[in-house]
């Protein structure tokens, strides 16, 4: 897993309180990790803060899995 992937995983574990081994690329934030809509908004905000980038609403709606978040951030992260 890339450095960005590891950072995404850490944020997900901290925000959702899930076991690290459950946070895999294919894991859906809602279906697999138990997030609700507020959790997903908070995750997006945490990703923006951690990686120094803005995630537009239309892009945020396409980030449904851990892998989606990692791919987006690998392309758009500033730090």
From Swiss-Prot:
PROSITE patterns: CARRIER (PS50075), PHOSPHOPANTETHEINE (PS00012). GO terms for biological process: lipid A biosynthetic process. Residues 2-77 form the Carrier domain. Its main location: cytoplasm. The keyword Manganese does not apply. GO terms for molecular function: acyl binding; acyl carrier activity; phosphopantetheine binding. InterPro entries: ACP, ACP-like_sf, PKS_PP-bd, PP-bd_ACP, Ppantetheine_attach_site. Keywords: Cytoplasm, Fatty acid biosynthesis, Fatty acid metabolism, Lipid biosynthesis, Lipid metabolism, Phosphopantetheine, Phosphoprotein. Coiled coil: none annotated. Pfam families: PP-binding. The modification O-(pantetheine 4'-phosphoryl)serine is found at residue 37. Pathway: Lipid metabolism; fatty acid biosynthesis. GO terms for cellular component: cytosol; membrane. It is found in: Cytoplasm. 4'-phosphopantetheine is transferred from CoA to a specific serine of apo-ACP by AcpS. This modification is essential for activity because fatty acids are bound in thioester linkage to the sulfhydryl of the prosthetic group. Carrier of the growing fatty acid chain in fatty acid biosynthesis. This is Acyl carrier protein. It comes from Bradyrhizobium diazoefficiens (strain JCM 10833 / BCRC 13528 / IAM 13628 / NBRC 14792 / USDA 110). The lineage of its organism: Bacteria, Pseudomonadati, Pseudomonadota, Alphaproteobacteria, Hyphomicrobiales. The gene is acpP.
